[in-house]
Amino acid sequence: MKSSKYSYSKINLFNSCSLKYKFLYVDKNYKKDEGIEAFLGKLIHETLEWIYKKKIEENKTYYSLDSIINFYKEAWNDNWHYKILKYKYIKRKKADYFTSGVNFLVKYYQIFGPRFNQNVYKVEEKIEFDLGGYTIKAIIDRIDREGPNKIHIIDYKTGKKMLSDKEMKEDMQMGIYGLGLSSIFPETNEIMLSHYYLATNQFVSVNLSDVDTESFSDGLIENIQEIEKTESEETYVANESKLCNWCYYWKECPVKNGSTPSEYMR
């Protein structure tokens, strides 16, 4: 077993920009900077985790909408910090993002509240599994048991862009989740993988049986081997894209100058 552990976020960062991967995972150049979209998404995840965790651990059977919004508001205020950024050409203000979160939760409550009777089994579940001698780790937003041998993996999304069915079958993150749970629960004969988009309250789902898991596994191993080769040869490359506008490493990057075109929010 190789010593390094790999996650979707680690592999995906390498694929998007291997130089940024170096700054974060090799140089350990950690920064407190955080995009407002990521901050909002994190707090929505925390609020939904709170709902279902209390249901699982305390058998809570009823929630008022006020209690949910209050939890979200307190989490927002407690976690807000001076290193939160937004792309400077976006006109939305701090209050606009906060209100977006409230709207997500209100709509979610209208569909699933006040009792939230889904068959939720685990929330924010940490998993690790072996793939070709590599340790793959992940944190799954939610796992539902929808029958004695059926598992439903749900990943919350606060962005507007929805994947197509074809894109879901090829999605690395969901593929990792599916492989992980199929190895942890080998008796399970059906694993459903879903994105739940809070902006539209829609599922986009694919059954793991419809995913070419052998090809996916081979591709993931090749991806990790490419990372190892790049680390060994130190051949990191800056990949310029629109994602640079949200990058916190402009001062360190040889193809950029000065500060990121994002600005701190107040």
Identify the residue ranges that each predicted region occupies.
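Nuclease catalytic cores
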Residues: 11-12, 16-56, 98, 102, ...
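Cys/His-rich metal-chelating microdomains
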Residues: 20, 250, 256
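Short, solvent-exposed helix-loop connector elements
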Residues: 29-37, 207, 231-240
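Polybasic (Lys/Arg-rich)
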Residues: 213-250
